[in-house]
Each structure stands twice: as structure tokens, then as C-alpha cells.
């Protein structure tokens, strides 16, 4: 990290507050060893059990980027889950993302639900946030994704 983040704070050892937050809040729960495998297996078992008799046992949000694409593949092919793929089209989809979603959903034999946000409304909201000059200009889009 560097000082391009105007609110960053470095301690006497040169370690930034973002790194300290990671060490304090994330790292204690980040198990990349057998413990993590057991925790994942337990969670997947609970998901499967809750999904017995249902068409889907989970929902996966997919943008078409590498992270959500890999998660979708992993859930279906490696973990044996039956996800419904959910995509929010807020007007910013690249053709590459759309192609990735279609190829992965078709290739894995999954169902896709796409929620299309009114582009005119989203554009006006994002423009208002941009003109206001405040932080977090992606707030309207983020709210649509998590609503």
C-alpha cells in the first residue's frame, strides 16, 4: 500500500491499517489447509440438506468475470451443488461478460435468471451521485446488486 489512499495510516513498523485489519479480522478465519476443507465440506453438506426436494439448493450471483465464473464452476462441478445463476444487468455489461455467462451456464447445464435494471433510471442516479462529488459513486448500482 502507499499514500494514494488519503486516509491510510502506517504504524511504527511501516504496516498500513488495511493490512492490520486483514490480519485482525480476515486472517483468523481464512483457513487454506485441511481445516478450511472441513469447514467447506460441512457448509456444502448443510446446503445440500436444506435443498433436498428443491430444484436449486443455492443461488450464485454471476457478473461474467473470472471470480463469479469460477465459483459457479466450482459449485456445480466440484461441490455437486445445484445453483440457480442470478445476474443483474445494470447497463454496464461488456459483451465479453455476457458471452462468458452464456457459455458457462450452457456448458454446465444451469438455469439463469437475469434482472434487468432500467438503464435510464440507473444512468440518472449514477450521474447524480457523480455530480454530487461524494464518495462511493457506485452506490446506486451496488444497491441494485444487493437488493
Segments from the language model and where they lie:
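ATP-dependent adenylation/nucleotidyltransferase module used to activate substrates
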Residues: 1-147
Amino acid at each position: 500500500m502507499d499514500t494514494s489512499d488519503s486516509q491510510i495510516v502506517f504504524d511504527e513498523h511501516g504496516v498500513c491499517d488495511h493490512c492490520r485489519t486483514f490480519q485482525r479480522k480476515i486472517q483468523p478465519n481464512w483457513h487454506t489447509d485441511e481445516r478450511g476443507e472441513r469447514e467447506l465440506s460441512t457448509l456444502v453438506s448443510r446446503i445440500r440438506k436444506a435443498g433436498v426436494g428443491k430444484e436449486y439448493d443455492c443461488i450464485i450471483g454471476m457478473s461474467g468475470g473470472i471470480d463469479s465464473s469460477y465459483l459457479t464452476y466450482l459449485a456445480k462441478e466440484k461441490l455437486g451443488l445445484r445453483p440457480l445463476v442470478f445476474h443483474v444487468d445494470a447497463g454496464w455489461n461488456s459483451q465479453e461478460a455476457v458471452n462468458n455467462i452464456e457459455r458457462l451456464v450452457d456448458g454446465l447445464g444451469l438455469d439463469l435468471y437475469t434482472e434487468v435494471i432500467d438503464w435510464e433510471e440507473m444512468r440518472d442516479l449514477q450521474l447524480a451521485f457523480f455530480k454530487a462529488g461524494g464518495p462511493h459513486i457506485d452506490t446506486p448500482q451496488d444497491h441494485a446488486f444487493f437488493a
